[in-house]
Each structure stands twice: as structure tokens, then as C-alpha cells.
Amino acid sequence: MASYWAVCVVLVAGSHLVAGTAEVMSHVTAHFGKALEQCREESGLSTAVLEEFQHFWRDDFEVVHRELGCAILCMSNKFSLMQDDARMHHENMHDYVKSFPQGEVLSAKMVELIHNCEKPYDDIKDDCERVVKVAACFKVDAKKAGIAPEVAMIEAVMEKY
């Protein structure tokens, strides 16, 4: 009976952690997305793709447009999240995610997922093409890990940023 309760406590604690990380991810997404308009022209992102980008976490949003990779690269550079070679700057990404309420619960997992998604595409020379593939991989892996936010969560925190 004691082991049953121990399992229940672990499951409940784990479910709160997943919910907490998804909530933190909603803050990260909302804040990061604020740089999109600044990067729209620079990246050649069409108005249609710009409007779709707000639905990044929806299952039916396809992360495939090269211009989206350019926009993500531009946005990442606004927050110093990339190194000169257009790969994630691990320390800066940790600090960025930790800057949000309860960000420390998400930071390591997010950096790990992005880093693992960078590896298979490392040989792609076109930075925008590589970044969009990494973003697509990250979206899938974040959903699998249970840290992807619901669109409603993002909308709820948008006004803070």
C-alpha cells in the first residue's frame, strides 16, 4: 500500500511539472514572438506566413518555410540566443528561459531538445533552411515531452510582453 501511494505522489508531482513546463513555454513563446514583426521584412516572411506563425504550436501548422527559419534566426539573434555559426548558444538560452517565471524547470530540457534537433541537420549550409528543420524537430519533440503550450496558454500571457 505504501508503494501505491509513492507511485501516486510521483505521478501527481510529475503531472504538475509537465503542466508547469508547458506554462513556462507559453511565456517563452509569447515573449520570443514579440520580435517577429521586427524580423518580418529582414527575413522575407510573407504576411500569410507571419499570420500563421502565431499558431506555431497547433498540430496543423507546418514548420517548412525557409523564410520562417530566417525569421526564427533573426528573432533568436535579437535575444542573443545564437552563436556566430547560427547554432544555439547554450548558456544564453539557459539564461533566457530562466528569466521567465519558473523558467528553471524548463531550461535544461529545452536546451537539450534543441541541441538534439540541431545534430541531424548540422551539415546543412543554408542557415535559414537548417533552422526551420531544427524548429520543426523541436516542435515535435516538445510535444512528445509534454512541454508544448496550448495556444490558449500563449494568448493568456501575450499581454505581459
From Swiss-Prot:
Keyword Cell cycle (UniProt): no
Source organism of the structure: Epiphyas postvittana (Light brown apple moth)
Domain of life: Eukaryota
Gene3D superfamilies: Pheromone/general odorant binding protein domain
Keywords, alphabetical: Disulfide bond, Olfaction, Sensory transduction, Signal, Transport
Signal peptide region: 1-20
Function, as annotated: Present in the aqueous fluid surrounding olfactory sensory dendrites and are thought to aid in the capture and transport of hydrophobic odorants into and through this fluid.
Annotated GO biological process: sensory perception of smell
UniProt name for this protein: General odorant-binding protein 2
UniProt-listed Pfam families: PBP_GOBP
S-S bridge residues: 39-74, 70-128, 117-137
Family: Belongs to the PBP/GOBP family.
Tissues where this protein is expressed: Antenna; predominantly in females.
Molecular function via GO: odorant binding
Keyword Transport included in the entry's annotation: yes
InterPro entries assigned: Odorant/phero-bd_Lep, PBP/GOBP, PBP_GOBP_sf
